[in-house]
Amino acid sequence: TRKKVSEFMGAENAEDVIFTSSATEAANRVLRGYGFEENMTVYVSPYEHNAVMRTLEALRKEKKFKIKVLETDEKGYLNLDDIEYQFMCDEPDFVCINLASNVTGYVLPAERVADMAKEYGAIVLADAAQAAGNIEINLKETNIDILIFAGHKSMYGLFGVGGFITNSRIFDRDKNITPVIFGGNGEDSLNLELSERGISRYEVGSPNIAAIGTLKTAIDTIEKDLSGTQERENRLLKYLIEKLEDIDGIHIFQKPETEEEFQNHIAVLSIGFEKYMSDDAGTILDGEYDIAVRTGYHC
């Protein structure tokens, strides 16, 4: 399974994959294990999960570094020219960027932001929780240092598995990420210190073998027709938007309009109702129409 995940994500080696219980745990392990220092500048996109933002906020209070938000245009898309100017004015030390929003479906230009950040020697962490299985990822061909993933979303694995993958071509995981969880792993058990290098430095305790095992079969299924799935979902997304626009009182957030915008969008859409609170609308759609939606704030 580790080899399958590494190939699917375009990692350099299978050993670059570390399994955790979730993307949330992976984000905490990476961010808490990294050596943030006072006066560092950390950039985030406006689309980060709370697994990233709450962890960074706790660390900011402790370590006294700065957190800045990457600039966007009037539609909420990242503005690369403005970001380039941001980096010139306050050089980045660390950049966190979501590959695809779980709220609006927007696919962020993460690779281009990573290229810009690397000009200043910054470390780049990308969150692929919503993207993995929806878009093609080839980590070793990018300037992204660390990739976080969730197994239960569009990778179609069971709940209880996630992880992080490091780009060993440009990032030394064992040197730069200190373990934050300690325990047994069946290796060198008489030694009270963890290994200084390798998978066993990070994977401790009893892994969720069942959930991890599902990823191999799930990825096999995805790989049979990823491009075909993307095309079908794109058609369904266009159809949904077309029909929603026929209904008065509905607002579509960050609606893709051009073909380029549709290509940079996964099959996730957020809408609002003029006459209903989101929770009320969700209850009506569920109870009267058997339509399942997620309502309220997203994590």
Language-model features, listed with the residues they occupy:
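Pyridoxal 5′-phosphate
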Residues: T1-C299
